[in-house]
Amino acid sequence: MLDYSRYKDESITGRYINLEAIQPCFTKLPHPLITIGSSVNGVDIQAFKMGSGDKKVLMWSQMHGNESTTTKAVWDMVNYLQLDEPLAKTILKECTLMILPMLNPDGAEIYTRENANKVDLNRDAKSLTQPESMAFRKLFESFQPDFCFNLHDQRTLFSAGKTNKPATVSFLSPSSNRERHITPSREVAMKLIVAMNTMLQDPVPGQIGRYDDGFNDNCIGDTLQMLGVPTILFEAGHYPKDYEREKTRELIFLSIVEALKTIATDKINDFKTGDYFSIPENDKLFFDVLVYNPDIVNTEFEAGHSVGIRYKEVLVHEKIVFRPEIAEIGPLTGFYGHQTLECIDSKDFGFPSTQKEILNLLLRFNK
């Protein structure tokens, strides 16, 4: 396992990563930037190359502006590749990487999923109505990658299958048709995912999920898979007590490097497609906070019911604030909480500052 502390870019941390935050990273690059187009608001969208090999890998992050964990991991990877490490040298010798760290700078600036026109770029791959989508497609066609890495964040509600473990990292080899056939490009992507999953089972056993492979030809992964290019969806999820996603960032970094190693060393066929389907499919079994016996605090709640709370991420003064909101009320059998509170237990509601907001939320509830 790589010593991550040597490669982590300490200049970018937290959840709010806009274009200004990564400008210092750009200045450290050994290669010139490539402007591939501009956003709705006229912001340059920039990419850069690393390596000189025949195996071409295109990777992009922050297609959704509020999904920044993978952007941090990409810069950690860049740091790693610039060091005098045998594997890094092999990757750069065997591969040419085209790296697009922020496809949606307008969304990143205001911490939204969509671009400035309120369009989800990951539902615009076929229609190509947005300048960011058109710039990406032009880059894809000119670079002609052999592999594509589509880098995202996922919500905290996902579990790794029907278990009490969060899906800390999830992957998908997207479908290329409604029948979800295992085409040659899908098979390659599946084997690369198996390689990453095998590695990740050491640091986070049982915490890797597989995304649903329902087909949508306006999603970028499905579109690229239709074009015959092995495409992998990476989803950075929740690690316990890591809402800033710094641990998940490390796991995404390790995953990207593992995939590049597998490509660079021609080890893809060492892995079996069948093992891809052994990765549990994501389920939605988690709340950020699961409160038992809320009727003890507020009699408006029904006895025997629980309250599932999820955090809303809000940008306040260039920081992300996590504001609790009631998501579901009911027996909630079979659900889990990243934090659980038992209202009978006075220790949980002893008014520590971290829980006052949740207590007030329960007290304000009215049917």
Regions from the language model: what does each represent?
Residues 1-20, 143, 172-367:
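C-terminal accessory segments enriched in acidic
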Residues 24-40:
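N- or domain-start disorder-to-order transition segments that initiate the globular core
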Residues 33, 47, 99, 148, ...:
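Conserved beta-strand scaffold positions in the cores of enzyme catalytic domains, especially
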Residues 42, 62, 99:
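Conserved hydrophobic/aromatic pocket- or pore-lining residues that grip, position, or stack substrates
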Residues 44-49, 221-224:
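Short, surface-exposed beta-strand/loop micro-motifs that present aromatic residues
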Residues 46-54, 62:
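Short beta-strand-to-loop junctions in surface cap/lid or active-site-entrance loops
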Residues 54-56, 68-206, 225:
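Active-site/substrate-binding loop(s) of hydrolase catalytic cores
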Residues 65:
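Short active-site segment of divalent metal-dependent hydrolases/proteases
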